[in-house]
């Protein structure tokens, strides 16, 4: 199999806002901007899906069983294809350094969204023990206006991170239950463990995109003879599973990845360096918007909808945050009711029960002076929690240009650049609200637009109860077509991937 961290940022996307929008009717312009914003949330999740399906769903049972005999150093190149159209390439190099290994992984990728081709580049360096356990790494992503760099080192039972985003470096420390792997370290370890049909392995994997460690599994399905070029080769078919997602790959006995297939039609094919980097072979791309929408019965005037009842099918829904607050979930049916605005309280929130939702994170830098100063300027001394939350919502809506950006959003970067989609709106709002003393969490799910449901993100604020709002749409509170599936940061939001391509929604009633 072949592992590439770069896929987790496959879809960093920028669309320049044209002055022709001013010639549109106000409602038509807003409809187009909203559709761009909800599309971009889905693209981030697509990047997570492909990264998980290809590159994190490989696994290891017995770390102690790995020996370095048979490890092959050198380079491996692949072309990346979308429905038979070449969209990029990936390159991995394994190097022996004394009693350890250095693994380099780089990828470049194009994606067509709404007629615009966007380019993403990632580079990962991983330094491991002789058994391919992670010692330290650095990860860089660059695309358009967005860039991020993460460095990490295993220190005892902690993974210590330096995260550079928005011009600021923050330190984070993550407790480890066991020594972790990066995705690109897995194949050498898997080869050493043995490719025997019927075997199943587990790997604890650290994902720089979500900054957490989770397990994945891989099973060796069959041993086959296939034709590769002008000759036959023995290959092993592997089924990779992560959180319900599956991908299939074929690798040779000595570890060459011949082919990989993901659930969304992305394919990696083994190529020479010259072939992999032949960018002139890229033909017309498939516009990703064709994969976004969840068809549904029509909802007239969704922004004014205060009650919605819908049937959700096609995928197991255990473990999602579908029940609670403004949602009632029974069987396969969810009801959403927009709450009346409560009286709220005086800022800052003084309870200790929601401290975690007032704290900064690596990407929600609510303790940074620039965030605090901006919140103070917006609120102008207003201490009423409801009014403050509403003012922040209106300011973020007005301040952030609706120029879609697929990235790993950072509040400081959004504050500086003032462009983005629903992820950027939600991240900046969350940072501003927390800095003002309003407990705030991020939600992800689906929202209805003119022709169906799209994946989307929005904040929820604590005003005596959790109130869903939407700074992307300037809704306070958010309309009832916002169906929440998860709450939490990016690591939790990526559970949405279980729904992609499977979820079906039937609107039963709305008003």
Segments (PLM) and residue ranges:
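Conserved hydrophobic/aromatic pocket- or pore-lining residues that grip, position, or stack substrates
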Residues: 84, 389-397, 429, 433
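Secondary-structure boundary elements
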Residues: 183, 342, 348-420, 489-494, ...
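Short, positively charged and aromatic/hydrophobic N-terminal segments
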Residues: 16, 20-26
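Position-driven detector of the extreme protein N-terminus
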Residues: 2-4, 18
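Hydrophobic/aromatic-rich core segments of domains that either
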Residues: 55-61, 229-237, 243-245, 249-250, ...
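Acidic/histidine-enriched alpha-helical segments
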Residues: 189, 200, 409-414, 449
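Short hydrophobic targeting helices and cationic amphipathic motifs
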Residues: 5-8, 14
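Acidic, serine/threonine-rich low-complexity disordered tracts
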Residues: 27-156, 163-167, 172-175, 186-350, ...
């Amino acid at each position: 199999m072949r592992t590439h961290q770069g896929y987790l940022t496959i879809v960093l996307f920028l669309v320049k806002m044209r002055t022709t929008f001013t010639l549109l009717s106000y409602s038509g312009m807003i409809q187009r901007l909203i559709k761009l914003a909800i599309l971009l949330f889905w693209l981030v999740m697509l990047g997570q899906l492909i990264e998980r399906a290809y590159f994190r769903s490989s696994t290891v049972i017995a770390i102690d069983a790995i020996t370095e005999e048979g490890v092959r150093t050198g380079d491996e190149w692949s072309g990346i294809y979308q429905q038979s159209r070449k969209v990029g390439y990936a390159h991995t190099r394994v190097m022996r350094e004394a009693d350890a290994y250095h693994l380099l992984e780089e990828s470049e990728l194009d994606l067509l969204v709404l007629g615009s081709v966007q380019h993403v580049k990632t580079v990962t360096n991983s330094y491991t023990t002789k058994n391919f356990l992670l010692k330290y790494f650095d990860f860089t992503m660059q695309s358009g206006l967005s860039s991020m760099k993460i460095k990490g080192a295993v220190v005892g039972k902690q993974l210590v991170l330096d995260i550079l985003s928005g011009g600021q470096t923050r330190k984070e420390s993550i407790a480890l239950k066991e020594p972790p792997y990066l995705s690109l370290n897995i194949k050498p370890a898997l080869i050493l463990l043995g490719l025997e049909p019927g075997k199943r392995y587990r790997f604890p994997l650290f994902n720089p995109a979500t900054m957490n460690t989770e397990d994945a599994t891989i099973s060796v399905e069959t041993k086959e003879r296939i034709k590769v070029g002008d000759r036959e080769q023995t290959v092993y078919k592997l089924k990779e599973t992560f959180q319900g997602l599956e991908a299939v790959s074929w690798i040779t006995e000595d570890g060459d990845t011949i082919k990989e297939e993901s659930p969304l039609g992305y394919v990696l094919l083994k190529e020479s360096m010259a072939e992999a980097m032949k960018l002139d072979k890229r033909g017309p791309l498939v516009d990703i918007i064709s994969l976004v929408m969840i068809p549904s019965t029509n909802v007239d005037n969704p922004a004014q909808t205060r009650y919605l009842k819908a049937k959700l099918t096609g995928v197991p829904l255990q473990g999602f945050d579908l029940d609670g607050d403004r949602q009632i979930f029974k069987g396969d049916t969810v009801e959403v009711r927009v709450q009346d605005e409560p009286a709220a309280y005086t800022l800052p929130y003084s309870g200790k029960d929601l401290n975690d939702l007032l704290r900064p994170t690596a990407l929600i830098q609510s303790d940074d002076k620039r965030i605090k100063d901006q919140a103070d300027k917006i609120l102008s001394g207003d201490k009423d929690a409801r009014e403050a939350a509403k003012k922040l919502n209106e300011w973020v809506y007005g301040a952030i240009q609706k120029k879609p950006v697929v990235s790993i959003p950072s509040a400081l970067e959004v504050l500086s650049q003032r462009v983005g989609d629903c992820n950027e709106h939600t991240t900046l709002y969350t940072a501003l609200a927390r800095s003002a003393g309003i407990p705030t969490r991020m939600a992800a799910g689906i929202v209805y637009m003119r022709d169906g449901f799209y994946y989307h993100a929005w904040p929820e604020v604590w005003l005596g109860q959790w109130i869903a709002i939407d700074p992307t749409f300037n809704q306070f509170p958010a309309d009832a077509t916002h169906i929440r599936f998860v709450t939490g940061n990016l690591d939790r939001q990526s559970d949405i991937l279980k729904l992609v391509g499977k979820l079906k929604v039937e609107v039963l009633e709305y008003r």
